[in-house]
A protein has these predicted regions:
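Acidic/glycine-enriched connector segments
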Residues: 1-156
Length: 156
């Protein structure tokens, strides 16, 4: 399954003027992997790029019904502090996902890293939106590279 699985990592803050372009590039990258035989797409369920990636997978699922959206969530309380609108979007994605996995029960200091490592450890490709050489996305991209996972940075 790992050889047919792609994960995503990207920044939470996405410039509003770039969302459509980022969505289109993400969709294009996913479709390229589908054509190579990828079926499983793991998304971390965060705001920003994760949300864009989830919607891109769901849109492509209309044309490629065999693909699967797998939400890999860091904890049950991930949405604490989110706006009602963001929670509703999250719940919509969660409802449409083919599978939901939690890597921790409760929020802890390291639960986001644990979720990111789980995504990478179960994938052979990673589509990223990395524009800064710092933070969780930077860590996850470097972790993926160290594990021999193919990284496709749509920000390049």
């Amino acid at each position: 399954m790992k050889e047919k699985t792609c994960c995503f990592t990207g920044h939470r803050e996405i410039p509003s003027g770039q969302r459509r372009r980022i969505f289109a590039k993400t969709e294009e990258a996913i479709e390229g992997l589908i054509k190579k035989g990828y079926l499983y797409f793991g998304v971390g369920g965060a705001l920003g790029f994760d949300t864009i990636a989830a919607f891109a997978v769901l849109k492509l699922k209309e044309r490629y019904p065999d693909i699967r959206l797998i939400l890999v969530l860091p904890c049950f309380s991930q949405t604490r502090g989110w706006s009602q609108e963001d929670i509703e979007i999250y719940d919509d994605i969660k409802q449409k996902a083919d599978k939901v996995v939690y890597t921790s029960q409760e929020y802890t200091r390291g639960c986001m890293h644990k979720r990111n490592r789980h995504l990478v450890d179960n994938s052979s490709a990673c589509i990223s939106y990395l524009t800064e050489n710092k933070g969780g996305t930077f860590y996850t991209v470097n972790y993926a590279k160290s594990k021999g996972v193919e990284v496709i940075n749509i920000a390049e």
